[in-house]
């Protein structure tokens, strides 16, 4: 058995390696090799979101679900595997938009810009397109040659998660409680399927009664009936990236159980109150958290590859 000191040393080395990998990311990574990459991505994302506002949330979710499973390496884009995991099957979308972006970028810079970086930039540009804050995306990630379905099933937070489970999920990825509450604010856009909030509608008491009644019309009690019917995560301004998500929580109008637990007499109540009344504070915390999330275990240097097609390895 390893001694305590050797275990500590191994942890320090692992932390140093992770830090070094993140340090290799740079905002200017493509300035010389593909100077028009970012503007090309932005134009494609803006067009996609203008055509279908919901796509903005879908692209943000793709980046989140990528980073939480073996790091921000575009593993979520590989056909099958992670896409078949419980949290992803039948709900992940936006692959066609990513493929379109990749095709456009390949046309100007062959095998230069990674799919992982496209996801990171597309998430930022989606938030901006819906009126949210911007931030500097660090670049230089490379694409994985593997995906991990089992890790997707264990590491992605579930809509039924308790506050303690959410804190643990995010902590294991190097994200603190404020990061977790801020990143949850991405639910100010997007929609969820009835099967993910049915139990909350019919079995929980910390939900506004009129809010629940309105939702029940499109989400019947019997399991299997209307499972894929959609409802906006933020019923107030569903297509605007703002702080209304937190204001809704103050009124017990969180759609998912994992939303409302952020304001239910627990340790995150004050953060929710602050973000609800101070949009600037939310925007600041959100951008910081997105940069931190984008730095989770990236492949850099000669690790991985630059995929020619985001859905399969070269």
UniProtKB/Swiss-Prot annotation:
Its cofactor is Ca(2+); heme b. The record marks 61 as: Transition state stabilizer. One of its GO terms (cellular component) is extracellular region. Ca(2+) 2 binds at residues 188, 234, 237, 242. It is an enzyme of class 1 (oxidoreductase). One of its GO terms (molecular function) is heme binding. Substrate binds at residue 157. It catalyses: 2 a phenolic donor + H2O2 = 2 a phenolic radical donor + 2 H2O. Pfam families: peroxidase (PF00141). The active site is at 65 (proton acceptor). CDD domains: secretory_peroxidase. SUPFAM superfamilies: Heme-dependent peroxidases. Glycans are attached at residues 148, 169, 203, 274, 309. GO terms for biological process: hydrogen peroxide catabolic process; response to oxidative stress. InterPro entries: Haem_peroxidase, Haem_peroxidase_sf, Peroxidase_pln, Peroxidases_AS, Peroxidases_heam-ligand_BS, Secretory_peroxidase. Binds 2 calcium ions per subunit. Binds 1 heme b (iron(II)-protoporphyrin IX) group per subunit. Disulfide bonds join 34-109, 67-72, 115-310, 194-219. Keywords: Calcium, Disulfide bond, Glycoprotein, Heme, Hydrogen peroxide, Iron, Metal-binding, Oxidoreductase, Peroxidase, Pyrrolidone carboxylic acid, Secreted, Signal. The modification Pyrrolidone carboxylic acid is found at residue 24. Residues 1-23 form the signal peptide. Belongs to the peroxidase family. Classical plant (class III) peroxidase subfamily. Removal of H(2)O(2), oxidation of toxic reductants, biosynthesis and degradation of lignin, suberization, auxin catabolism, response to environmental stresses such as wounding, pathogen attack and oxidative stress. These functions might be dependent on each isozyme/isoform in each plant tissue. This is Peroxidase 2. The gene is PRX112.
